[in-house]
Curated annotation (Swiss-Prot):
Chain positions carrying an annotated carbohydrate: N87
GO molecular function: chitosanase activity
Catalytic activity: Endohydrolysis of beta-(1->4)-linkages between D-glucosamine residues in a partly acetylated chitosan
EC number: 3.2.1.132
One Pfam family, short name: Glyco_hydro_75
Annotated gene: csn
Taxonomic classification: Eukaryota, Fungi, Dikarya, Ascomycota, Pezizomycotina
Signal peptide: 1-18
Naturally occurring in which organism (per UniProt): Aspergillus fumigatus (strain ATCC MYA-4609 / CBS 101355 / FGSC A1100 / Af293)
Protein name: Endo-chitosanase
Role this protein plays: Chitosanase catalyzing the endo-type cleavage of chitosan, the deacylated form of chitin. Chitosanase may be crucial in the degradation of the deacetylated portion of chitin in the fungal cell wall. Chitoolisaccharides produced by the hydrolysis of partially N-acetylated chitosan are known to have many biological activities, including antibacterial activity, immune-enhancing effects, and elicitor activity. The chitosans with higher degrees of deacetylation were shown to be the better substrates.
One GO cellular component, as annotated: extracellular region
């Protein structure tokens, strides 16, 4: 599931499916990046690279949860690569040293006509930690499995789903398809992600964030799935305030 990223940090030109960061979300990004989190739901996590456990799940945005660290004057987190799920060794996931054949919500997603999420197609975020101390379960704060998440990366907005959890204490991880949307010029593979702590992951509380059968779960490409959850993502982001 998790790997030590060897990041390339070149800023890439966004793909056609990138969305402009709306003004309210840009304000949130700028406001909360610096400083400290006032409402730490759980701290003591790492980014999977440095070993520093300065990262926390933060509740400073009403109705949402995001990852933040007070280190270095305040920062978000990186984007390590997750290849778990169906076809976990396919394509650029072939060199993933820790890929697993299932995701945390495999049993739930089966109702939508697929055996599991495919990291090469479905843009999902790894959010929540179990198996090591500390732990964090987003469901205890109202997040629902397979709910839409907003990801601000490389000065763009993308939508993903909450699709997996981490068995250790590291944070900042997403499916390879989401990472390629964010950083198309970084040479993303199962063993190479984005190391800068500048990615904002936002999870939304409530059943309203779950796309259910309206999402294109059986899509054969990432863009098709991404577009199927955009309208819901836009509505969720529009409700956010700094």
């Amino acid at each position: 599931m998790h790997f030590l990223a060897t990041a390339a940090v070149l800023a890439g030109v966004g793909l056609a499916s990138a969305y402009t960061v709306p003004a309210n979300l840009q304000q949130i990004y700028n406001k909360h990046k610096t400083g400290t989190c006032q409402n730490k739901l759980q701290d003591g996590f790492s980014d999977g690279i440095s070993g520093s456990r300065s990262f926390a799940y933060c509740g400073d945005i009403e109705g949402a949860i995001f990852l933040h660290s007070s280190a270095n004057g305040g920062q978000y987190v990186n984007m390590d690569i997750d290849c778990d799920g169906a076809n976990n060794s396919a394509g650029d996931c072939a060199n993933d040293p820790s890929g697993q054949s299932m995701t945390a919500f495999m049993d739930t997603v089966k109702q939508y006509g697929i055996s599991d999420l495919d990291a090469n197609i479905h843009p999902y975020v790894v959010f929540g930690n179990s198996g090591s101390s500390p732990t964090f379960d987003p469901q205890q704060y109202g997040m629902e499995p397979l709910s839409v998440m907003a990801v601000v990366c490389n000065n763009q907005l993308f939508y993903g789903i909450w699709g997996d959890t981490n068995g250790g204490t590291s944070t900042g991880e997403a499916s390879i398809s989401l990472a390629k949307l964010c950083f198309p010029n970084d040479g993303i593979t199962g063993d190479n992600g984005h190391g800068e702590e500048d990615v904002l992951y936002i999870g939304f509380m409530g059943q309203d964030a779950v796309p259910g059968a309206s999402a294109a779960w059986t899509a054969r490409d990432t863009k098709t799935f991404e577009e199927s959850i955009k309208a819901l993502g836009d509505r969720l982001v529009a409700k956010l305030s700094a």
